[in-house]
């Protein structure tokens, strides 16, 4: 791991936090089909390139019965499962993603969605919603898919960081949907209308507030991924903010 392994985790984490917060602050905000943001340059460029060369190979668990999705948890003691020579950098990534600074940046940028969520959850305001970050590295292989879904109510904010080496996997991003009459023509997407696919570009990502029917019938956070075709893993980091520390993956 060379330079990264020799640098103190806390120093790396501070640099990562500063970059991540700046990225989120500069993110594009969209309210259609539901409140979400798209951000670029989430990691410092040199760190990102080094990180890609040092994706962990140990500590993953299968998520799908087909084995097309493998997951490596990056929170709590799970970081200790990562190879020792890679651990300091990934511990810094974990510290950044679970930091109060990143949480605050997300709260500010997605305040409109959090206000909708708060009303549906019957809490006084968005500030009363608890956000507990639990990041996970995902490695998806050829054939992986997940049908459109709004996410479980245990999740308050879903945030995904794309980690490809180049733009050749750009078609493999997450698709956002909405319920509409046009959706009846899209049997493959369970009669939901695809609105857009967020390109799977290097060092970019998105985040949205999880909204169910009781939060808003017109702003439900429908998203999914049609079957991917790829000759190499699709690597991403899902940083999910849960409603409390007792739930999550």
Residue ranges and their predicted role:
Residues 41-43, 163-167, 211-213, 242:
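Short loop segments at secondary-structure junctions
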Residues 2, 143, 150-155, 172-249:
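Catalytic core of Fe(II)/2-oxoglutarate
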Residues 97-157, 164-177:
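Non-heme Fe(II) oxygenase catalytic core, chiefly the N-lobe of the double-stranded beta-helix
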Residues 1-32, 184:
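Fe(II)/2-oxoglutarate
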Residues 26-113:
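Non-heme Fe(II)/2-oxoglutarate
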Residues 54, 58, 166, 244:
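Phosphate/oxyanion-binding loops and surfaces in catalytic or ligand/nucleic-acid-binding neighborhoods
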Residues 37, 83, 87-97, 101, ...:
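Active-site rim elements
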């Amino acid at each position: 791991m060379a330079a990264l392994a020799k640098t103190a985790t806390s120093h790396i984490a501070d640099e990562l936090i500063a970059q991540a917060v700046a990225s989120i602050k500069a993110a594009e905000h969209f309210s259609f089909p539901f409140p979400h943001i798209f951000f670029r340059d989430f990691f410092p460029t040199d760190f990102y390139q080094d990180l890609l060369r040092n994706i962990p190979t140990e500590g993953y668990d299968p998520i799908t019965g087909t084995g097309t999705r493998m997951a490596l948890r990056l929170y709590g003691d799970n970081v200790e499962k990562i190879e020792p020579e890679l651990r300091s950098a990934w511990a810094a990534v974990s510290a950044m993603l679970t930091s109060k600074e990143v949480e605050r940046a997300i709260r500010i940028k997605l305040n409109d969605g959090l206000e909708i969520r708060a009303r549906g959850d019957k809490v006084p305001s968005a500030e009363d919603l608890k956000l507990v970050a639990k990041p996970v590295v995902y490695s998806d292989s050829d054939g992986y898919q997940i049908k459109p879904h709004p996410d479980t109510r245990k999740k308050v904010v879903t945030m995904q960081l794309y980690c490809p080496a180049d733009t050749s996997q750009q078609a493999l991003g997450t698709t956002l949907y909405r319920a509409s009459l046009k959706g009846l023509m899209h049997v493959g997407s369970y009669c939901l209308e695809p609105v857009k696919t967020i390109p799977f570009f290097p060092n970019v990502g998105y985040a949205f507030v999880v909204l169910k029917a009781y939060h808003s019938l017109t702003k439900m956070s429908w998203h999914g991924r049609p079957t991917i075709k790829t000759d190499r893993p699709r690597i991403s980091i899902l940083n999910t903010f849960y409603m409390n520390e007792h739930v999550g993956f």
